[in-house]
Curated annotation (Swiss-Prot):
Gene3D superfamilies given in the database record: Bira Bifunctional Protein, Domain 2 (3.30.930.10)
NCBIfam families found in the cross-reference section: PRK12292.1-1, PRK12421.1
Compartments where located: Cytoplasm
Gene Ontology MF terms in the entry: histidine-tRNA ligase activity
Any one cellular-component term (Gene Ontology): cytoplasm
Family the UniProt entry places it in: Belongs to the class-II aminoacyl-tRNA synthetase family. HisZ subfamily.
Name of this chain's protein: ATP phosphoribosyltransferase regulatory subunit
UniProt source species: Hydrogenovibrio crunogenus (strain DSM 25203 / XCL-2) (Thiomicrospira crunogena)
Cross-referenced Pfam families: tRNA-synt_His (PF13393)
Subcellular location, principal: cytoplasm
UniProt pathway: Amino-acid biosynthesis; L-histidine biosynthesis; L-histidine from 5-phospho-alpha-D-ribose 1-diphosphate: step 1/9
Record key words, sorted: Amino-acid biosynthesis, Cytoplasm, Histidine biosynthesis
Gene designation: hisZ
Keyword Amino-acid biosynthesis applies: yes
Length: 389
């Protein structure tokens, strides 16, 4: 019974030395790659007042946010469940830079619920966000950074999944759906409930062209030829629809020639509908039952609650969740030298010199505890020299 106090909550795990070393290696690899692409590192706090943490586009995180009362102010605080709203707050309220901003971030987040399909309740989130540009060029830049970052940490066999939530949004608008009908349709598409969708479309009072567009929607799922089908079946509905599909076509054209990158499309995918405003994208590891490695999308308008709505696109990945797919970094075995636990200025100088040479220094308390063959620092003729037991 007593041992139960050592158990961690469901979905919250320790990282032991080998895993922690591996995670830190790849964290550094990713951040270095972001920096070389012009993205500046920011580190938001682990907790904030819920007034800012769960406002605007962050409202959808309320059910996943662990909350508590701040003993200093009496106000409600929350532990972040996603870092993107925090980064948007920093970009809007703290940096206040005009033009394009590129920011990256890393940190642990905490969720109230354990979703086994998505892994840990305490992911280590790392990502990059681009603020201040609305064109297809910034979407392409962010997707390219996502793909190249995964390649740089050794994940080569990738599937890039693309969608655009504005396609469904515009179809609902041109068809004159009521707010209730829109809400019902979004719910049906999120659940992938095909029979319900068929019944819903059959009951719509819309033009024949609009009904055909709704009937076509679920079939717009597959390879890059999907965009051509969508252009033929949907582009004529409105000018905004044509723009959304042309935007998608530009992204597909850019990535179609990437070696080892498969492209999958699903124009009925509404993941993050309450949050995203345009392109949505994700990367999957093909050899792991289509495990989602990274995801992102456009979320224009974020930051309006802080006084300045931002054009924004970005992506993030759970580094802890990806550990099993990453190989342990190959590194030269470091030399270990043992040093006695005494204070001596000359000894400290010798230790500092060895550490500069990347030698690991471990203190020993009893000489007899050292194994035979161990290297250690010994005081001989008033000098600290390396000896072997």
């Amino acid at each position: 019974m007593q041992q139960n106090i050592w158990f961690t909550p469901e979905g919250i795990e320790d990282l032991l030395p080998e895993e922690a070393k591996k995670l830190e290696f790849y964290r550094r690899q990713l951040l270095d790659g972001f920096e070389l692409s012009g993205y500046d590192l920011v580190l938001p706090p682990i907790a904030e007042f819920t007034d800012s943490l769960l406002t605007g586009k962050g409202r959808h995180l309320a059910v996943d946010t662990c909350r508590f009362t701040d003993q200093e102010s009496g106000k409600m605080m929350g532990v972040r469940a996603d870092m993107t709203p925090q980064v948007a707050r920093i970009a809007t309220n703290r940096i206040k830079q005009t033009g394009i901003q590129r920011l990256c971030y890393v940190g642990e987040v905490l969720k109230t619920r354990n979703n086994k399909a998505k892994g840990s309740r305490s992911p280590i989130e790392i990502g990059a966000e681009l603020f201040g540009h609305s064109g297809v060029e910034s979407d392409i830049e962010v997707i390219e950074l996502m793909v190249s970052s995964l390649h740089n940490i050794g994940l080569q066999d990738l599937t890039l999944s693309l969608g655009h939530v504005s396609v469904v949004d515009e179809l609902m608008n041109v068809s004159g759906l009521t707010p209730t009908q829109k809400e019902n349709l979004v719910d049906i598409l999120l659940r992938k409930a095909v029979p319900e969708y068929t019944d819903f479309v059959a009951e719509l009072t819309v033009t024949e062209a609009q009904k055909q567009a709704f009937e076509l929607l679920l079939s717009l799922c597959g390879d890059i030829a999907t965009v051509t089908e969508a252009m033929q079946g949907l582009a004529g509905l409105s000018e905004p629809m044509q723009r959304h599909l042309a935007h998608l076509q530009s992204v597909v054209d850019h990535f179609a020639g990437f070696d080892g990158l498969k492209i999958h499309m699903d124009l009925a995918d509404l993941r993050g509908y309450q949050y995203h405003t345009g392109m949505i994208f994700s990367c999957y590891a093909a050899g792991r039952k289509m495990y989602q490695l990274a995801r992102g999308g456009r979320y224009d308008g974020i930051g309006s609650e802080f006084g300045s709505a931002q054009l924004a696109t970005g992506f993030s990945l759970d580094l802890r969740g990806a550990l099993d797919l990453l190989t342990s970094p190959a590194e030269a075995e470091k030399e270990i030298v043992y040093a006695p636990n005494v204070y001596d200025a000359d000894l400290q100088a010798e230790i500092a010199k060895l550490k500069q040479q990347k030698t690991i220094i471990k203190r020993f308390y009893e000489f007899d505890a050292l194994e035979k063959g161990s290297r250690y620092l010994a005081l001989q003729a008033s000098q600290w020299i390396l000896s072997v037991k």
